[in-house]
UniProtKB/Swiss-Prot annotation:
Condenses 4-methyl-5-(beta-hydroxyethyl)thiazole monophosphate (THZ-P) and 2-methyl-4-amino-5-hydroxymethyl pyrimidine pyrophosphate (HMP-PP) to form thiamine monophosphate (TMP). CDD domains: TMP_TenI. It comes from the Bacteria. Binds 1 Mg(2+) ion per subunit. This is Thiamine-phosphate synthase. Its cofactor is Mg(2+). It catalyses: 2-[(2R,5Z)-2-carboxy-4-methylthiazol-5(2H)-ylidene]ethyl phosphate + 4-amino-2-methyl-5-(diphosphooxymethyl)pyrimidine + 2 H(+) = thiamine phosphate + CO2 + diphosphate; 2-(2-carboxy-4-methylthiazol-5-yl)ethyl phosphate + 4-amino-2-methyl-5-(diphosphooxymethyl)pyrimidine + 2 H(+) = thiamine phosphate + CO2 + diphosphate; 4-methyl-5-(2-phosphooxyethyl)-thiazole + 4-amino-2-methyl-5-(diphosphooxymethyl)pyrimidine + H(+) = thiamine phosphate + diphosphate. Gene3D superfamilies: Aldolase class I. 4-amino-2-methyl-5-(diphosphooxymethyl)pyrimidine binds at Q40, L41, R42, E43, K44, N72, S111, K140. It comes from Clostridium tetani (strain Massachusetts / E88). 2-[(2R,5Z)-2-carboxy-4-methylthiazol-5(2H)-ylidene]ethyl phosphate binds at T137, N138, S139, G167, I187, S188. InterPro entries: Aldolase_TIM (IPR013785), ThiamineP_synth_sf (IPR036206), ThiamineP_synth_TenI (IPR022998), TMP_synthase (IPR034291).
Length: 209
């Protein structure tokens, strides 16, 4: 672990399908003004060229506000736009290999559902872990679920930041209070709202209460 002073409090994962035609850059800017501390660009059904162009565009916004940009899964895109980091799942390239490719200075996030996965990711050079799905989620139909109990156990087992993901909204975020996690990752709870800035402020408020 390389101390990168990561603020994972409110981690926004993008999904343009939820935006209903709204401009991603504009929505991101509102989210950042509302308290988003970390942005992950996730694009599943676009060409590499399109992903690159979107990432370049988004980087302008994240740079403006000094917010780290994390690219989902695509190490090549992350390097091409000089994003601050990359997030990988258990079925993507192994974390230790990704760490070698991106070097020591970039942020490496890894998804983990079990203590074994979490400890391995930490050994392999992860800077933070995404743990979930904690609650049922529409954005990832095949997401394995992780109990709040397991989330707590993972938090206690590792010494890198833990971000909970999966179905987190203003109605259930307080159930995560006693877990001592470092942040929450959300998609539709922010992107699906008319007032994105307010949605971020409310979530951050609940989480910090």
């Amino acid at each position: 672990m390389h101390n990168k002073n990561l603020d994972c409090t409110l981690y926004l994962v993008t999904d343009r399908d939820i935006l209903k035609g709204r401009d991603l850059k504009k929505v991101l800017e509102e989210a950042i003004l509302g308290g988003t501390t970390l942005v992950q660009l996730r694009e599943k059904n676009v060409s590499s060229k399109e992903f690159y162009e979107i990432a370049k565009d988004i980087k302008v916004i994240t740079d403006k506000y000094n917010i780290p940009l994390i690219i989902n899964d695509r190490v090549d895109i992350a390097l091409a736009v000089n994003a601050e980091g990359i997030h990988i799942g258990q079925k993507d390239l192994p974390a230790n290999i990704v760490r070698k490719i991106i070097g020591e200075d970039k942020i490496l996030g890894v998804s983990a559902n079990t203590i074994e996965d979490a400890l391995k990711a930490q050994r392999d050079g992860a800077d933070y872990l995404g743990v979930g799905a904690i609650f049922p989620t529409n954005s990832k139909k095949d997401a394995e679920s992780t109990s709040i109990e397991t989330l707590k156990e993972i938090k206690n087992a590792v010494n890198i930041p833990i971000v909970a993901i999966g179905g987190i909204n203003e109605n259930n975020v307080q159930k995560l209070k006693e877990t001592n996690i470092d942040g929450i990752a959300v998609i539709s709870t922010i992107l699906g709202k008319e007032d994105v800035k307010k949605a971020c402020e409310e979530l951050t408020g609940f989480f910090n209460e």
